[in-house]
Curated annotation (Swiss-Prot):
Domain of life: Eukaryota
Gene Ontology cellular component terms for the protein in this record: chloroplast thylakoid membrane; photosystem II
Function according to Swiss-Prot or TrEMBL: One of the components of the core complex of photosystem II (PSII). It binds chlorophyll and helps catalyze the primary light-induced photochemical processes of PSII. PSII is a light-driven water:plastoquinone oxidoreductase, using light energy to abstract electrons from H(2)O, generating O(2) and a proton gradient subsequently used for ATP formation.
Transmembrane regions: 21-36, 101-115, 140-156, 203-218, 237-252, 457-472
Protein name: Photosystem II CP47 reaction center protein
Organism from which the protein derives: Ceratophyllum demersum
Subcellular location: Plastid, Chloroplast thylakoid membrane
Length: 508
């Protein structure tokens, strides 16, 4: 037929059987990819340290999505929360991956069947004898079925009525586990960080979808609306479907990047705004303050800080620190975290406590500046030593560690103090193993960053596709130069310009 690459889909334009076939094959490819990707990730995933080497540090992409829906165990005998298990059951990570691959195979066979047996009676219009689809009726069927699935997910899976529940955690990502969730029917259900809103919104949206589906099955569209929106044209379906997909892609890009109950930080890593706002740092200082008020020493108060919380307060876990074109997991960048060295407290020769100014997200390098409790600069690592007034040597800065591996250790030699001041710019200080994976020391993004980038990019692309196909279907007569309701047969190629009244026509 010699079609250009961007017009190859015209081969299924007036062929409902094969249109169905290629969509089933597409589902087979998507499901097959999901299952295969899950098996690949399981082959390379190391579950041994859920605190310092969680799935998001290892660049896992599909494992977090399975986990948030209630899968936590592996046939390998491990659980995502740590420890070993004896009977993971069918719905383990491998079980879900296998189910997707089996479903992919069945879809593959169904696609071949529908490609071979394309001329089915169901696709034939009784009045004309030509292949056609009752698109408003199909819309009603799909709306009803998707509403049913949506309602079922919210009412049964999420609530734990018949299903595992979903991943729920505290605001600081420390106590996450899979549990059943009760629907939140009040104003709190609209808070994106309240898990109960997931159940209530799915129940509400599912109910609406079921009712709307029944409506579209029982009520025919008015003729003027049918013609105005070109409801008989398959390209209208394409255009409106693309609209639904790009809208959803924009929404999930937002919920992923800004964070929500659907994207827990234990599974996808923290957001960049948690670093920008000092979110974890404030919580750490609050806990230390509480410890001191209970008459604990500084060392004891810092030792009670969970390593998991300290690890979130490290710039290397900020998804905005990795470049879009730096391939690989976070572990391939700054290395595998081995242990927390402890919290460094700097003091000058007058005994004032100094705080290292932290690096903002979009800086690769940043001057080392130490300020006191009032924000006054007291020490720095100068660019020009000849003109320096506040250098570590001149001010006599010392550092002492509280909590972590270096608990109680102090240093006063300037070279070591400057080393830890530079590292304190990046948040809490961790020992990182860069040898195992040959990590290059350049920060990478987390799956949160990749998901957002991918979905925002495709949403923009699909937005253009919606405009393109919507315009094609609405203005088809203008583009073709033919009135769609024309009774007379037009002889193509004989008129001078579009709409020329002298065009020769032959009445049918």
């Amino acid at each position: 037929m010699g079609l250009p690459w961007y017009r190859v889909h015209t081969v299924v334009l007036n062929d409902p059987g094969r249109l169905l076939s290629v969509h089933i094959m597409h589902t087979a490819l998507v499901s097959g990819w999901a299952g295969s990707m899950a098996l690949y990730e399981l082959a390379v995933f190391d579950p041994s340290d859920p605190v310092l080497d969680p799935m998001w540090r290892q660049g896992m992409f599909v494992i977090p999505f399975m986990t948030r829906l209630g899968i936590t165990n592996s046939w390998g005998g491990w659980s995502i929360t740590g420890g070993t298990i004896t009977n993971p059951g069918l719905w383990s990570y491998e079980g879900v991956a296998g189910a997707h691959i089996m479903f992919s195979g069945l879809c593959f066979l169904a696609a071949i069947w529908h490609w071979v047996y394309w001329d089915l009676e169901i696709f034939c219009d009784e009045r004309t004898g030509k292949p056609s689809l009752d698109l408003p009726k199909i819309f009603g069927i799909h709306l009803f079925l998707s509403g049913l699935a949506c309602f079922g997910f919210g009412a049964f899976h999420v609530t734990g009525l018949y299903g595992p529940g979903i991943w729920v955690s505290d605001p600081y990502g420390l106590t996450g586990k899979v549990q059943s969730v009760s629907p939140a029917w009040g104003a709190e259900g609209f808070d994106p960080f309240v898990p109960g809103g997931i159940a209530s919104h799915h129940i509400a949206a599912g109910t609406l979808g079921i009712l709307a589906g029944l409506f579209h099955l029982s009520v025919r569209p008015p003729q003027r609306l049918y013609k105005g929106l070109r409801m008989g044209n398959i390209e209208t379906v394409l255009s409106s479907s693309i609209a639904a997909v790009f809208f959803a892609a924009f929404v999930v890009a937002g919920t992923m990047w800004y964070g929500s109950a659907t994207t827990p930080i234990e599974l996808f890593g923290p957001t960049r705004y948690q670093w920008d706002q000092g979110y974890f740092q404030q919580e750490i200082y609050r806990r230390v303050g509480n410890g001191l008020s209970e008459n604990l020493s500084l060392s004891e108060a810092w030792s009670k800080i969970p390593e998991k919380l300290a690890f979130y307060d490290y710039i290397g876990n900020n998804p905005a620190k990795g470049g879009l074109f730096r391939a690989g997991s976070m572990d391939n960048g700054d290395g595998i975290a081995v242990g927390w060295l402890g919290h460094p407290v700097f003091r000058d020769n007058e005994g004032r406590e100094l705080f290292v100014r932290r690096m903002p997200t979009f800086f690769e390098t940043f001057p080392v500046v130490l300020v006191d409790g009032d924000g006054i600069v007291r020490a720095d690592v100068p660019f020009r030593r000849a003109e320096s007034k506040y250098s570590v040597e001149q001010v006599g800065v010392t550092v002492e560690f509280y909590g972590g591996e270096l608990n109680g250790v102090s240093y006063s030699d300037p070279a070591t103090v400057k080393k830890y001041a530079r590292r304190a710019q990046l948040g809490e200080i961790f020992e990182l193993d860069r040898a195992t994976l040959k990590s290059d020391g350049v920060f990478r993004s987390s799956p949160r960053g990749w998901f957002t980038f991918g979905h925002a990019s495709f949403a923009l692309l699909f937005f253009f596709g919606h405009i393109w196909h919507g315009a094609r279907t609405l203005f088809r007569d203008v583009f073709a130069g033919i009135d769609p309701d024309l009774d007379a047969q037009v002889e193509f190629g004989t008129f001078q310009k579009l709409g020329d009244p002298t065009t020769r026509r032959q009445v049918v």
